[in-house]
Amino acid sequence: MIELYSNAKLPTEFGLFRIYTFVNDENKDHAVIVRGDPRGKENVPLRIHSECLTGDVLGSLRCDCRDQLIQSLRYLGRQEYGMLIYLRQEGRGIGLLNKIKAYSLQDMGADTVEANLKLGLPVDSRNYSFAAEVLRYFEIKSIYIMTNNPEKIKSLIESGINVKGRIPIFSDPTPYDKFYLETKKTKLGHEIENI
């Protein structure tokens, strides 16, 4: 169950949005960035973005998170309506402390999957049930999801969300994230077309 906590206008370089904050049963706060009025609409463009302090905020080149976030906000800013659900699930759900431990193992040659497993952690422990609850809160009838991750789509469908299609996100690989993106494609099944 989720509870709306607050909302306010959010002017950005990508356009005017509204930010909503919700609290879930685990007392975790999540943000929903809304463009226009998607309530009760069909074919709503949606991005579900998991928190990434190193990429989103610090501009790390180890991942493509910031690219995906910026591309999504830019895309949504050109739409009549749409949503970005920002989930507090740092490091595919393992948290910031463990994510930095995993980075250390990656510095020694492990890929992102191997690093999590060496730490005794799940490869991906994210949960998208909160996102499904948000979509129900806004009475969204159907979505087009901006993602390369088929597990997100599967999870939403299993939660009863009508997913009409996928909007791919393209990132130009850098020397720092090429191995990471290749691993996401080969080991996690991400649909990354330019790797």
UniProtKB/Swiss-Prot annotation:
Its EC number is 3.5.4.25. Keywords: GTP-binding, Hydrolase, Metal-binding, Nucleotide-binding, Riboflavin biosynthesis, Zinc. Binds 1 zinc ion per subunit. Zn(2+) binds at residues 52, 63, 65. The keyword RNA-binding does not apply. GTP binds at residues 47-51, 68, 90-92, 112, 147, 152. One of its GO terms (molecular function) is GTP cyclohydrolase II activity. The active site is at residues 124, 126. Catalyzes the conversion of GTP to 2,5-diamino-6-ribosylamino-4(3H)-pyrimidinone 5'-phosphate (DARP), formate and pyrophosphate. Belongs to the GTP cyclohydrolase II family. This is GTP cyclohydrolase-2. The lineage of its organism: Archaea, Methanobacteriati, Thermoplasmatota, Thermoplasmata, Thermoplasmatales.
